[in-house]
């Protein structure tokens, strides 16, 4: 007789009694602005402990391959850390990425702050890892206001941004290398904000250098500089401003054309 296979549940039991650390999440920008290093009870366990290893390029096997080509992966490395422990657990299912040698950078697709196990795995293999600044594919007023709130200045026209500083402070404290910007929100509130976003990006770089922790931005091709959302699928007239250097500094460092 046929016997049904036992279903293995991939859920923690007695979750309310778990003392293992959770990944670092922020529900609002206000929550982010209130964050301070070391104030969370599990902060030490959520910090990376492995510095970014140096890498070297081996002998080129295929003469037709372009040595300047770069590969960046966007991956759900720890998709259940919000409910499970950010340091792993006894669950049956796990995503153990093992192709680090092919990557130039990894994006932690789940949120702003990669969990420590993922940062350490990337760094052991010499791969920079980025958190994700995610803005919905949307034109709702709520989502437009959320994007605009990111760009709130210390005072009007100051070109200094409190959220930019917090992003750098987060990366420095938890030990990751920058952010992937997935900005797909569009609408009347968003369309004029391209120049202000460029100022935000440049200020981030300036502040990061001032605290001796330079970070990088990777840019997903969705928001144009002046006209809202449009996938140009290349670096061109609608988006080049986000890559255009100023005083030797690029607003963003890598360009992710499309999937």
Residue ranges and their predicted role:
Residues 6-94, 220-225:
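Boundary/entry segment of secreted carbohydrate-active catalytic domains
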Residues 64-256:
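Chitinase-like catalytic core of GlcNAc-active glycosidases
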């Amino acid at each position: 007789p046929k016997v049904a296979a036992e279903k293995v549940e991939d859920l923690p039991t007695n979750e309310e009694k778990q003392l293992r650390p959770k990944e670092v999440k922020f529900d609002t920008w206000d929550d982010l602005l209130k964050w301070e290093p070391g104030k969370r009870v599990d902060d030490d366990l959520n910090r990376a402990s492995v510095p970014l290893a140096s890498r070297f390029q081996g002998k080129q096997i295929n003469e037709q391959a372009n040595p300047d080509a770069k590969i960046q992966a966007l991956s759900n490395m720890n998709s259940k850390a919000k409910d499970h422990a950010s340091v792993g657990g006894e669950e049956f299912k796990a995503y153990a990425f093992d192709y680090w040698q092919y990557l130039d950078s990894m994006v932690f697709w789940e949120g702003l702050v990669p969990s420590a196990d993922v940062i350490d795995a990337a760094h052991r293999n010499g791969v920079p890892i980025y958190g994700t600044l995610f803005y919905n594919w949307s034109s709702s007023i709520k989502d437009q206001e959320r994007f605009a709130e990111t760009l709130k200045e210390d005072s009007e026209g100051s070109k200094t941004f409190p959220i930019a500083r917090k992003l750098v402070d987060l990366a420095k404290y938890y030990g990751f290398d920058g952010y992937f910007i997935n900005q797909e929100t569009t609408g009347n509130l968003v369309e004029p904000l391209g120049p202000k976003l460029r100022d935000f990006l440049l200020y981030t770089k300036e502040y990061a250098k001032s605290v001796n922790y330079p970070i990088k931005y990777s840019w997903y091709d969705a928001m144009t500089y002046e006209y809202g959302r449009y996938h140009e699928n290349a670096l061109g007239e609608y988006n080049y401003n986000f890559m255009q250097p100023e005083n030797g500094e690029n607003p963003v460092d890598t360009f992710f054309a499309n999937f």
